[in-house]
Amino acid sequence: MSSLRLVALPLCTWLVLTASAESGSPPAPTTLNWVLPVRSARLSPGAVQPRTLSLPGMTPLFLVGQDTTSLEWLSRHAQALQKLGANGLAVEVDDARALRRIQMTAPGLNIWPVSGDDIAEGLELEHYPVLITPTGLEQ
């Protein structure tokens, strides 16, 4: 099975949520209580080695958690992520307050609470924060 197919399948929840959101408007954490908490057993905060990928047509996607490392990374890269048109997944988040903290770190970016386990398996990924583009992984 191709890497693209392995990544595309777990993004179904994310795509449904994204399609129902207003453009450029982050989801209100209280409307997402039904999916919280989010846990990603295959992922943890840590260093990600850059790697080349071939996922033509994929919209840039980043994975973050509620940890300090993720929040600092998100704050540092928010402008670049916005320029890329990247969407975010909060792959480790306890509650609406933690989700709101993540979203407020990068106003203007859509960040959804979705487990990253299937993406981690498909891309052989162990850590976040990470940016996934059509051409590679980077931190």
Residue locations for each model-derived region?
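Non-globular targeting/processing and membrane-anchoring segments
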Residues: 2-4, 14-61, 65-109, 117, ...
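Helix-rich interaction surfaces within compact, conserved domain-sized segments
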Residues: 106-114, 119-124, 130
